[in-house]
């Protein structure tokens, strides 16, 4: 028997419900107003009063309206058919909704229950299985989608029977499992899982041991992201956060991409809707949309669903990780999620923290980021969820609570600088403010030594030192004037500019320069570093400036040339000759 209740108070989208039975924390309920039912979540229980946040506009709701509690938390449906879909924060399929605007109380099926899938069994009768063990697989787009023992089945089971190869609907019984007490359990292709609960169906969670290539030079070369790692991109408005995220989503070496548009402008999401079905994935040759799931909760959608959208994205990511896949989850922007938490906290009259954010903001963000990671599955395979979020600090202030809390949880920090954005140095990742703690991991060092070059991390730090010294020299030149400092200061500054223009800047709108493979990055970086380590004899600062400007121009043309093409090799020879003429 479901618990019911009546509306007893309304504070914007927080509704106080007088319940006639037991109600659980985070339980889902439906609030009725007329013929419309709106989904809501219990966020606080005091006696027989349940405080629920409604995921829709509460306009027209009145005291005494009926409320039905469902007896379960907010859940996502996990089944074949998730890829290429566009969802809202509550996993309603946006394509199935009519009209320009989403009507209040709209609910659609997240997957097609009538579609048939070609099933191939992987388990056989007599096998011992546990939660997340693979029973079979179906082909979803080009990904082999594993049919697993549901995550909710926590005991050990014996396979009694598995369906034969053939076409089935997701609701058909795929296997029958017997538990230790002899009871049979039927398993279909579809399962549900609460979004706020991490999927822990794995045997081990080792530290990341390899990097995830993104094709973005300032990330891969200077501050690499690890596969199964966490990172975030803070930056003021207009600094290029969204373009950088789109570039990473197009080029990242991942099997599945989940993009969560959390409180962002709708036109940016529409851009993805239009672009991704047309763009080709360089790793597979298929369209990008075939490996992408978009969870869209734009700024004009209900604020309460923003929190749900990031959890929905992460849960779907954990589901695909359990299939042994590399998943990249990106949220744009987690600041909007934190603002939604602030609104809820204020309406509940909780004690405010800094800037009125909840006192436990740091714990909430840390718990969420901890769900990402590399895991060893029950079958011995590995899967990973890499999480990359953006933060939009008010006024570009990187000391505000959301940035500070995220900094504690994320291992990579890609600070976008307003100064670099204003001078059109894109991507505007500040080379001195940004960092990747993965460079300190011995496992990552070994991987880089083996797959790129021995002592690669030392070369990266050498490049950062050149950039740092160049900035210091530039400060001196600005204070004392061009003639007021030795020519060595100008040389130091221009060497840092060479690294900046050739390695740290990249054209996201050029077909060749947008995606730079690691092999090419290594060759270009070694070449630039070799020049920076050379001694030059310049007569004056103007000669130094002219030489490096010419050199930067040749390198820029090289960046726009096909890798190892005649044009590319031609520029390389020109650069070598140009440098040898000027060397001491």
Specify the residue positions occupied by each region the protein language model found.
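Short alpha-helix capping/helix-loop boundary micro-motifs
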Residues: 14-18, 50-56, 113-124, 158-162, ...
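Short beta-strands and strand-coil junctions in structured, solvent-facing domains, enriched
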Residues: 15-16, 38-39, 50, 60-61, ...
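Short, compositionally biased
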Residues: 43-49, 80-91, 142-166, 184-199
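P-loop NTPase nucleotide-binding/switch module
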Residues: 97-152, 169-229, 244-247, 282-299, ...
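C-terminal amphipathic alpha-helical interaction region
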Residues: 539-584
């Amino acid at each position: 028997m479901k618990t019911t209740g009546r509306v007893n108070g309304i504070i914007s989208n927080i509704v106080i419900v007088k319940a006639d039975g037991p109600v659980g924390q985070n339980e889902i309920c439906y609030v009725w107003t007329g013929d419309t039912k709106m989904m809501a979540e219990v966020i606080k229980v005091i006696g027989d009063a349940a405080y629920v946040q409604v995921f829709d506009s509460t306009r027209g709701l009145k005291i005494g309206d009926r409320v039905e509690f469902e007896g379960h938390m907010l859940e996502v449906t996990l089944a074949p058919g998730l890829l290429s879909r566009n969802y809202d924060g509550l996993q309603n399929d946006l394509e199935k909704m009519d009209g320009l605007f989403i009507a209040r109380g709209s609910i659609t099926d997240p997957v097609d229950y009538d579609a048939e899938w070609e099933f191939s069994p992987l388990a056989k009768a007599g096998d011992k299985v546990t939660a997340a063990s693979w029973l079979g697989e179906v082909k979803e787009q080009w990904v082999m989608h594993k049919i697993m023992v549901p995550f909710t089945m926590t005991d050990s089971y014996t396979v009694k029977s598995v369906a034969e190869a053939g076409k089935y609907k997701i609701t058909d019984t795929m296997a029958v499992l017997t538990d230790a007490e002899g009871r049979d359990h039927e398993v279909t292709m579809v399962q549900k899982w609460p979004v706020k609960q991490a999927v822990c169906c794995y045997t081990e969670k080792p530290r990341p041991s390899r990097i995830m290539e993104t094709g973005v030079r300032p990330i891969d070369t200077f501050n690499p992201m690890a596969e199964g790692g966490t990172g975030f991109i803070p930056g003021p408005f207009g600094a290029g956060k969204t373009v950088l995220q789109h570039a990473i989503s197009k080029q990242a070496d991942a099997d599945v991409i989940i993009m969560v548009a959390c409180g962002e402008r709708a036109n940016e999401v529409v851009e993805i809707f239009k672009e991704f079905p047309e763009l080709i994935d360089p790793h597979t040759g298929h369209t990008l949309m075939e490996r992408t799931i978009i969870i869209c909760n734009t700024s004009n959608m209900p604020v309460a669903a923003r929190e749900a959208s990031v959890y929905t994205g992460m849960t779907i990511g954990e589901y695909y990780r359990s299939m042994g896949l590399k998943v990249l989850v990106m949220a744009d922007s987690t600041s909007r999620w934190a603002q939604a938490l602030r609104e809820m906290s204020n309406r509940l009259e909780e004690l405010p923290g800094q800037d009125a954010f909840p006192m436990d903001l740091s714990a909430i963000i840390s718990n969420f980021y901890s769900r990402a990671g590399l895991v060893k599955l029950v079958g011995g395979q590995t899967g990973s969820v890499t999480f990359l979020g953006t933060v939009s600090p008010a006024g570009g202030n990187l000391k505000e609570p959301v940035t500070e809390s995220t900094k504690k949880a994320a291992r990579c920090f890609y600070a976008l600088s307003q100064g670099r954005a204003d001078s059109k140095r894109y991507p505007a990742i500040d080379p001195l403010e940004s960092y990747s703690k993965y460079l300190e991991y011995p496992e990552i060092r070994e991987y880089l030594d083996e797959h790129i070059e021995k002592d690669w991390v030392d070369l990266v730090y050498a490049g950062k030192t050149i950039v740092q010294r160049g900035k210091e020299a530039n400060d001196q030149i600005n204070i004392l004037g061009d003639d007021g400092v030795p020519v060595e200061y100008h040389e130091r500054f221009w060497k840092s500019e060479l690294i900046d223009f050739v390695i740290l800047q990249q054209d996201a709108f050029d077909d060749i320069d947008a995606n730079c493979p690691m092999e090419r990055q290594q060759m270009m970086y070694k070449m630039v570093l070799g020049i920076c380590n050379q001694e030059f004899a310049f007569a004056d600062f103007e000669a130094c400036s002219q030489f490096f400007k010419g050199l930067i121009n040749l390198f820029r043309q090289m960046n726009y040339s096909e890798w190892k093409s005649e044009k590319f090799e031609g520029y390389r020879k020109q650069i070598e000759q140009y440098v040898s003429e000027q060397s001491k």
